[in-house]
Regions:
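Hydrophobic alpha-helical transmembrane segments in multi-pass membrane proteins
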Residues: 134, 187, 193-372, 437-481
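Hydrophobic membrane-insertion alpha-helices, especially the h-region
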Residues: 9-22, 463-473
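Non-globular, low-confidence helical/coil segments that flank catalytic cores
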Residues: 48, 92-94, 98-107, 124, ...
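Membrane-interfacial loop-to-helix junctions in multi-pass transporters
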Residues: 172-176, 241-248, 382
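Membrane-interface amphipathic/re-entrant loop segments adjacent to transmembrane helices
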Residues: 142-157, 161, 201, 362-378, ...
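Membrane-interface helix/helix-cap signal primarily in integral membrane proteins
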Residues: 8, 15-16, 20-206, 532
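Divalent metal-coordination and catalytic microenvironments
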Residues: 47, 106, 183, 211, ...
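N-terminal membrane topogenic signal
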Residues: 2-10
Length: 552
């Protein structure tokens, strides 16, 4: 019998990894990004559009590759990627398409977090292999050619657009078209921001992002359709049938992963399904922690920076929570009737997934839905029906039956969105809580200790869990008191007033982006407040309950 190592070594190794990641976070986050310093000033730059433009209220957001920069007497060749924010001057402005070569006059800005605890958009862009973001008006942008983009993601995006048009041809329109395209194809560019917020507040944001839920639905449908081939055969033929069936299933699943853009969550799900199918052919155990670890290793081998992707972290933490906690939660509620077992499974899986993703969700979004159980009891079966109807509509788009299916999709998606909006408007639908990396580490350790207590039934793990949660609460109280000392940000004319505690400081604003430092660690980007910039400042202040006294 193989030697069994005490579980405490696994606990200590995990704790060491968490602490190491916590300390490694700071050098990465605070190190000076010296790359592309020559892009800080406005220059004429030639760029290549890599992906379809994303519609925004101000115009379009483009993912581009910087090709060259024109200086006074020379041309500098570039190779970095960036985001290009294109503001349309007129309603008839020409929209660049994938593959277009543009000539723009702009500068690349590397954003910084405005206040302590704010989302660091500049760090996010670096993790997406982008040096920054450039702002340009459509009148300052000229198309000078087109070079087709031949990357795998570009081909996937083009395939997505063709399938979205099939939905439109079948009769889907408006918000229903955007919603169905999001949950079946992963095309979320046309989703309204208010709808995204509604699903997040109701605890159903996972439905909008194609992930293991949607991949599992497609997998179940494909298996159901293919398993009627052949009946019980002798052993050799049975093995051959298993191999052929698995090959067909995996071919379809990887094609679906390609269509949805090869996001980390879909890759994780399809990789796990691949391992499951291989195990089924070899008659081995299917889903386990080893399967999840193998999928994570393959994803990180392909792209190490995906470790810092929110999608990657949410996907793997949700599955980890389900694998660890669901067996024990199910044992607390034995259910024999099918209907009762369905309700139990939805509840236990939802609780386990929320528990697994809680540290990540609080760190990035600062909120958690209180009524996620009420939401998932309705949303999960509705999502199954929507995905099945959506795939059937794509297949039968130009037939009478396809038109009927599209009408059913339109009705069901509209009803589901209204239900989610109703959940959002219930009293106390969300719990707002901003956490620091230290508090995230406390939450992870608390979840790990809870699992060890359930598994080992030893009081020491419960005591450790209570101590860790006490540390979490102390840290939260300290941060709340510190935040209370820095509340008000006001602008009057060209003077910025900043209140921290009982004192008020004032700073003159320049006619450009200005960098300010308050106290020891808080940073603010302020700008000369007039016109559209003042509207942007208003939106920012309203979102964070910051007061603008007067603007002249």
């Amino acid at each position: 019998m193989a030697r069994s190592y005490p579980f405490v070594f696994i606990f200590l190794a995990t704790a060491l990894c968490i602490v190491s990641a916590y300390y490694l976070h700071f050098p990465f986050n605070l190190c000076a990004d010296t790359e592309a310093d020559y892009l800080d000033s406005a220059r004429v730059i030639r760029v290549h559009v890599l992906e379809p433009p994303v519609s925004k209220p101000y115009g379009y957001m483009l993912s581009v590759r910087l090709l060259s920069m024109y200086e006074a007497d020379s041309v500098r060749l570039l190779s970095q990627q960036a985001l290009l924010r294109l503001e349309t001057d007129t309603a008839h402005a020409v929209v660049p398409q994938t593959g277009d070569i543009l000539l723009v006059r702009t500068r690349v800005v590397r954003p910084h977090a405005l206040f302590k605890g704010d989302f660091d958009y500049g760090r996010y862009l670096r993790l997406q292999h982008k040096v920054g973001i450039a702002y340009v008006r459509s009148s300052q942008c000229r198309t000078i050619g087109n070079v087709p983009v031949r990357t795998l993601r570009a081909k996937a995006a083009a395939c997505q657009q063709r399938l979205v048009r099939r939905y439109a041809d079948a009769g889907l329109f408006g918000s229903a078209l955007a919603f169905v395209s999001a949950i079946t194809l992963g095309e979320k560019d046309e989703l309204d921001s208010s709808l995204r917020q509604s699903f997040a507040a109701a605890g159903a944001a996972h439905v909008l992002a194609v992930s293991g839920l949607h991949t599992g639905i497609i997998y179940a449908v494909v298996v159901a359709l293919l398993t009627f081939f052949g009946r019980r055969r002798p052993l050799y033929e049975q093995r051959l049938r298993r191999a052929l069936l698995s090959a067909a299933i995996l071919l379809i699943m990887w094609a679906y992963a390609f269509v949805t853009g090869l996001s980390p969550s879909v890759l994780r799900a399809v990789l796990m399904l691949t391992i499951v199918q291989v195990g089924w052919v070899l008659r081995r155990q299917a889903i386990s922690l080893n399967t999840l670890a193998a999928a994570a290793c393959i994803c990180l081998f392909a792209d190490p920076l995906s470790l810092f992707s929110v999608s990657f972290q949410l996907s793997f933490s949700a599955v980890l929570g389900i694998l660890l906690f669901v067996p024990y939660l199910n044992s607390l509620w034995p259910a024999e009737r099918k209907s009762v077992r369905y309700v139990r499974d939805v509840i236990t899986v939802s609780i386990a997934a929320v528990a697994g993703t809680l540290p990540v969700t609080l760190y990035y979004y600062g909120q958690v839905a209180r009524y996620f159980l009420l939401t998932n009891l309705v949303v999960l079966p509705a999502a199954f029906v929507l995905v099945v109807l959506g795939i059937a509509t794509l297949v039968l788009a130009h037939t009478l039956l396809g038109t009927w299916l599209a009408a059913a999709l339109q009705l069901l998606s509209t009803w589901l969105c209204r239900y989610v909006e109703w959940i959002e408007h219930l009293s106390g639908a969300t719990l707002q809580l901003t956490v620091t990396p230290w508090m995230v580490m406390c939450l992870v350790l608390c979840l790990l200790c809870s699992y060890l207590f359930i598994r080992k039934r030893r009081l020491v793990w419960a005591i450790v869990c209570v101590v860790v949660m006490a540390g979490f609460c102390v840290s939260h109280v300290y941060d709340a008191r510190e935040a209370a000392q820095q509340q008000t940000f006001a602008v009057r004319g060209r003077v910025l007033y900043y209140k921290h505690g009982e004192s008020i400081d004032s700073y003159k604003l320049e006619n450009k982006f200005t960098f300010f430092r308050f106290g020891e660690t808080d940073y603010v980007y302020a700008l000369y407040v007039s016109g559209k910039k003042y509207k942007a400042l208003q939106d920012y202040c309203a979102e964070r309950q910051i007061t603008i006294v007067e603007n002249r």
